[in-house]
Amino acid sequence: MILTEFDYVRPADLDEALALLAGTRGARILAGGQSLLPDLRSGADRAALLVDIRRLAELRAVTRTPDGTRLRIGALTTLAELATDPLVLAEAPELAAAARANGDPQVRNLGTVGGNLVAAGRATDLPVAAMAADAVVELAGPGGRTTLAAEELAAGPAPADAVLTALLVPAAGPPAAFEKTADRATRYPVCATAVRITPGGPRIAVTGATSRPLRLRGVEDRLRGGPYRTEAVLAAFRAEPRELFVPGRGTSAEYLGHLVGVLTARALQRAEQALAR
């Protein structure tokens, strides 16, 4: 039962959606609704107006950008679609793996790429995969379209009057992998990691063990050049500031820091094996 009252509009196109967001204080975007609707029911969030963008075809589909250098993943692409898309599987496998690991089939069928990225909390999988891929998000707002690094989006909320329209991922990216340990009941990550091995060194992003999804540049620097033996990876994690890792439900910060280090070593070794093929 939703206890608060609000208005509801289903805009015909993106321009109408943007006008509604700009013209109504307290307007919120409704897409998959996996985070917003439970929060409205519980009273954790409020809205004066729900702008339902679920039928905006322009925000769907996975394509290549005109110059062929990036994949453009529409914000309304569901997690189930992302997990099985041939282009994503071939060129951004950590994104497909993160989508597969997200929740149960019902969550994946309803949840969207845009919603998962905007949520960007401690218990979301897709932001770390996007950060490891060096992806950017495309935002549409009153001033036109802009881009923002996925890492910057995870650090703070998107503008309230903007709509996340797409995720842009470098095409044919370097070897990558995603690993996760999840709560059996909720499928929320206890911790998760995504990695890519680039010519300049590894890119590593983690969630669950930290207060929000983070790139671990200190760990990346310590591991530059590899090889990615488990003990070397764990030593790189132990060198991080103790306060970086935060306790979870029934788990200590020290344990989570160790666990995410083990997962990162596993992911790096898988990506390294792919690089050798």
Placement of each model-derived feature along the sequence:
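C-terminal structural segment of proteins
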Residues: 1-277
